[in-house]
Each structure stands twice: as C-alpha cells, then as structure tokens.
C-alpha cells in the first residue's frame, strides 16, 4: 500500500503522496533527493509541493502548498516526505510473493 500523508488546511483534506510518474516529473524538473540535506529549505518546499501532484494537482495550481508552507510545517514531515518519495523506487525492486510473473535472472561477470 502506498504511503500517504493526509492534511487538513482551511477545512479541506488533502492527500499527499508520490507515484513513479510524480517522482519522474520532479526529477525531470531537476530535483535530486540525494541533495535534500545539502539544500533543506529548497528541498522541503519542493518535496511538499511535489507530494500534492499525485492526488491534488489542482491544489498546486491554486498555490495551496505555498500558503501552507507560509504557516509552517512540522519538523517530522521532512523525513516522512523523503520516505514517501523513495517508495516508488523501492517498489520497482520488489517482487510478488506468489512467484507468478516474477523475473528470473542470472548475472555473469
């Protein structure tokens, strides 16, 4: 199950999360999660705004993430956003437990 964060702002609930497509979109725009600790201010704003794209794209157009950031974010959210951002990549390397359709491979060096 995909990890999400649900927030309420101005009496409206928003679901934040990432998909392969939204991570790809952020990478194409120049975001690199490996630089998050070197550029924390930019990274938290980019991650927070990007987390709206999967479920709440209209909110980004209406500048809702910017309004929320101006009011402040919980410190713990930075780590959770990074964890959620990495989830689609981790999912690529997981295979189903039933064995059906799983890739079989062998490396020779």
Question: Residue spans of the language-model regions?
Answer:
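Short linear motifs in exposed loops
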Residues: 17-18
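Short, hydrophobic/amphipathic alpha-helical patches that form generic packing surfaces
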Residues: 43-54, 83
């Amino acid at each position: 199950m995909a990890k999400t964060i649900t927030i309420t702002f101005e009496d409206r609930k928003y679901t934040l999360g990432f998909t392969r497509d939204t991570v790809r979109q952020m990478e194409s725009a120049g975001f690199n999660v490996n630089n998050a600790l070197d550029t924390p201010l930019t990274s938290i704003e980019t991650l927070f705004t990007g987390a709206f794209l999967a479920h709440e794209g209209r909110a980004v157009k209406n500048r809702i993430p910017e309004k929320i950031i101006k009011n402040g974010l919980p410190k713990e959210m930075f780590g959770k956003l990074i964890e959620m951002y990495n989830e689609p990549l981790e999912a690529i390397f997981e295979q189903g437990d039933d064995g059906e359709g799983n890739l079989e491979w062998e490396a020779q060096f």
